[in-house]
Amino acid sequence: MLLSPLALSLPGYVIQKKVSPNYPKRNFDMRTTPPIALYRFGNFLHRHGFRRTAKLLSWINRFFFSVWCPSSASIGKDFTLGYWGLGTVIHSNVKIGDRCLIAQNVTIGRNFGDKGVPVIGNDVYVGAGSVVFGEISIGDNVIIGSNSVVNKSVPANCTVVGNPFRIIKESRLETWHELKDKC
């Protein structure tokens, strides 16, 4: 069905009823839904052989929303961009899991000369201004603090901050969206 890739970008109350009851509830946010919807539709076109049209949608996303998120990137369900995703750059081969939030001015890509790109797990929060690069993996349920530089793999269930990053909390059981609901 053509609308199913776009349905992944719809507000939480729609997703919750139609896809899975375990997704965090979100209100409709006009600031982040259009860039993600453009990505989803472009990704659908890319997977079905309409690569030029998909690339055009990526450029529209870049021009109107300042988000570089190529249609060839693999991004899971309930992906969120913070503050329109302004200045966000995501490499075309990156794999991002479900229920991730990428804040503004984040770069996710490869290191100069390296061929590998990051693989990001489920329930990951990447704070504003962070840089995640190289052939690394970010485990599930990780919080990356603002302005952090991550160039080595990060285990699951932890919080990392700094440049170079350091782990400040391990064995964290709450996901980022559960912590957000407590604040």
For each feature predicted by the language model, list its residue ranges.
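Active-site-proximal flexible loops/turns
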Residues: N111-F112, K169
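Left-handed beta-helix
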Residues: P70-S71, G76-K77, G82-Y83, H91-S92, ...
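Terminal amphipathic alpha-helical/low-complexity segments used for targeting or macromolecular assembly
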Residues: M1-V67, F165, S171-C183
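Short coil/loop residues immediately preceding or within conserved phosphate-binding loops
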Residues: F64, G85, K115
